[in-house]
């Protein structure tokens, strides 16, 4: 969309942070209002992450106004909240392309802008990176400042606390801003907090604080009195704080929607030495009432009419694979009170809302703590329960050692329901489920299943749930199922595939939900089509049968070719000294950018047309 100068006259003056810093402070509330309206106008037309950005408008303006970005380095955790940052840093007119193929990256991205210091997408990385950047800046000696912005969800992760513990030890000059949008601010408490925050962050208080510590450090009774006095003053703002114990100078909480107050506090804190912590309170979805009332629904939105206040309803067609999983989970839990379900902050995305309501005592949202989720499941299994870890493929990477050390080595019966496997679409490189088959396949005695449709998905979940000799995994994609009939649940024979149709010369061995595309290719080329079902253990007898009765084999999977299911087929053939030619079709050896699933599959040759072209070129 073209930028309407008449509609956004103040925002029109700001196409860089240098231009922002030329504005008089008095114009900044108006700028924030226009920025929020422009964000609503843009995202409603193009889709994208929405509610988080509405909540960080004032913070973004204040940070870029006070700090000399991009020389001073501003780091956003996760990046859902960074749309206003992109708008103010030279990407205003392109914001309508965000998350689209060839458009702006969905998150801060180093290759996109010098203002994007750290490429992000996964949670809780900002403080660790910020410490490294601050240490490097200190050694550089150019008085470059470092600021990390992290949300109240992301800061619950262990990695964030590991980083803060380290910062308290080495004491780099840096600021961590906690964007806390869990509750709204009482006007009276907020006003008191803002006044005291400015007092406590001011030079006079800081000088007295540090000077007093030095003068009286050798006099234990006075040192203790000073400590208690300071704690009493701070108790008016917040009654004790973990962040002070970790070594940070804590200020807050303050109103994150008071842009002028934020500027005063940030200016006071800018020159303080050592690790600083500013706690701000914001409202997710601020300025757009429907998003304020339902920030979860409006977290990421499709195109919608902002005047209606409603998101478009789904067409009511085929269920998603997440819904298939959620329904199976409820069905199984109703029959077995040993079932326990775990998710690391992905209740809605993983299809677990209904389960959490029906079985609240068997539902565990452990927050953004993938490592804990897996080892917690191990403990439940040791205790005689049947844990299921529902997790996105890209986030299971964060708990790899726990899968190995705490589950697999001990042969514990934990079922991993791996959602968002394969190409996920608009979230791009950081969220593609490209690697799970590769990193799980090498784990001894792990059972790994790849359903070709929703009925197989249910049967495999049932099979994995009743597998008691070790861990198992079922991986399924983002998006809708294909519409096959759901049959009664029964256990599948472990490690056995099935031949779907017989052809000549060429056999296609399919792993997973690319089956409809593979079926079209098999029909066009008169090829045998096999639903392999299991990546581990592989159906070696079936692979050898196909090798003996065909001139060439093709493997198909929506996972990295390197180390994936096709690599496993190659290993079987080489181990048995079978000289048959094999073409492995899957995800290539680079990080796949954003675009719709259909766009990226077509570009990568993973639709029927692309597969057939690859096979014909290979056979020529």
Curated annotation (Swiss-Prot):
Record GO terms (molecular function): 1-deoxy-D-xylulose-5-phosphate synthase activity; magnesium ion binding; thiamine pyrophosphate binding
InterPro entries (alphabetical): Dxylulose-5-P_synthase (IPR005477), THDP-binding (IPR029061), Transketo_C/PFOR_II (IPR009014), Transketolase-like_Pyr-bd (IPR005475), Transketolase_BS (IPR020826), Transketolase_C (IPR033248), Transketolase_CS (IPR049557)
Keywords tagged on the record: Isoprene biosynthesis, Magnesium, Metal-binding, Thiamine biosynthesis, Thiamine pyrophosphate, Transferase
Cofactor note: Binds 1 Mg(2+) ion per subunit. Binds 1 thiamine pyrophosphate per subunit.
Gene Ontology cellular-component annotations: cytosol
Positions contributing to Mg(2+) binding: 152, 181
Gene3D superfamilies for the chain: 3.40.50.920, 3.40.50.970
Cofactor(s) essential for the protein: Mg(2+); thiamine diphosphate
Xref: Pfam families: DXP_synthase_N, Transket_pyr, Transketolase_C
E.C. designation(s): 2.2.1.7
A biological-process GO annotation: 1-deoxy-D-xylulose 5-phosphate biosynthetic process
Assembly notes: Homodimer.
Name this protein carries in UniProt: 1-deoxy-D-xylulose-5-phosphate synthase
Native source organism of the sequence: Escherichia coli O6:K15:H31 (strain 536 / UPEC)
Lineage: Bacteria, Pseudomonadati, Pseudomonadota, Gammaproteobacteria, Enterobacterales
Gene: dxs
